[in-house]
Amino acid sequence: EVCRDKYDAVLPLVRLLLHHHKLVPFVAAVAELDLKDTQEANTVFRGNSLATRCVDEMMKIVGKHYLKVTLKPVIDEVGYSTETVFRALSPLGNHSDVNGLKKYLFSQLQENLRYYVDKVFREIVRSSISCPTLMCDVFYSLRHLAAKRFPNDPHVQYSAVSSFVFLRFFAVAVVSPHTFHLRPHHPDAQTSRTLTLISKAIQTLGSWGSLTKSKLSSFKETFMCEFFKTFQEEKFTESVKKFLDDVSSTESKEPSGVSEPVHLKEG
């Protein structure tokens, strides 16, 4: 074990490494150790290891502005809208044709959800130019370490990056915008449900590869399986691949991502 009490140690450790510009080589070193214990390519960086926790904390610190310019406008739209995905599903009991109304509202639900998922997905895959250089450098390192560990798997270089930038960064920010300072307060129950579905959609679309039957069957909601069949197009996969290529390249984008001095201790 590199660190027995890694959860308490991670945040101050990341702050210290950022302050001394040593985070990238440290993450590379602990990620390599992590990969040595990983037996299957499809489980790369999926656990709560020291490496994954360090990258998580780094993204929260370095990626604040990136999240704001990429997601805040559409998150605000979901939050302020009077017609969020589930808002119209309230009292149906007094309607003369409850089943007919349910069918109509169900179609509206899918329509609205598709609109928001499309918009969030589009904003993300167009955002690579805004991704902080430090995040790109970390992703570049993780990508090549994963490819080295599993040389016969052509997809692992992408899943190594998507497991962070989609699953642990964008999807988490969508479902909990208040914790990333994208919204001032915890969303109400209906908005929260909408954001949860959008987040789940982004996780699925961000997973490298096609939307297989096994992925579709993992949804508890039957309508989500039908919903995702509309995304089974090569253009979505290619958009994700290009985005992952861009954010894991060494080409300079945003100067550093750390616009303010890193505080070694809070309070």
PLM regions and their residue ranges:
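Extended alpha-helical scaffold/tether regions of large eukaryotic proteins
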Residues: 1-267
